[in-house]
Structures are given as structure tokens and as C-alpha cells.
Amino acid sequence: TDKVSLDEAAIVVSGGRGLKGAEHWGIIEELAEVLGAATACSKPVADMGWRPHAEHVGQTGKPVAPNLYIAIGISGAIQHLAGVNGSKVKLVINNDPEAPFFKAADYGVVGDAFSVVPELIKKLKARQ
């Protein structure tokens, strides 16, 4: 499948350090594929080499303003929030209820990405 470009994506699925390693990136790719979305990441993820810097979203990376921005395992540093501020709807999935991103989010799910995201993928596939 052709990957959706970050510049023109209506939906962006973005992953952070909460994914615990590059080997877990598959859930980001799979959710993006089901939604027809682009993938992105936080600066720490790019700095650790889990993803290319071209996918790094934020003040020091690429600013994005999709219709829907889904942040998975991203705590929400001010630099990251500045880069996604133009997003119409922000959905945050994080296991830390105190993550700053929840204050900036339109919708938030407090839960483990490794159980929430596969469940979301299953529900979305069932509706297709």
C-alpha cells in the first residue's frame, strides 16, 4: 500500500516513547493503514532512532494540522503540542492520566496502548 504523506494527511497516527521500542511500531502502522492515515512520531522516538526524523512532529520537527491527530504513548511536551496545535481534533491514548497531552486533547483514553490500539483496530475493521 502507498503510504499517506504527512503533508497532506487528513488523519495522522503518531507514536511516542510509550511504545517502549521500535519493535512495537507495528500497531501505529496498522492503525494508520485502517484509517488511511499518515504516521508520525515524537522527537524522542526520532532521536532514539526508532523512526526517521522526517516523521518527527513538533516545534522542532514538522508542524501538522490534520482533521484528526491520534497521539499514542506521547506525554505531550510543550514543543510537541506546539507542532500539532492546528489539528482539528486531538485524541490521546496514554497510560499516564497525568500526561500533559490530556489537557490539550479533545478526547482521551487512559489505558495501555498495547491493549487499546489493537481493540480499536479490530472495531474499525469490523465497520469496514
Language-model regions: role of each:
Residues T1-Q128:
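N-terminal glycine-rich FAD/FM-binding segment characteristic of electron-transfer flavoproteins
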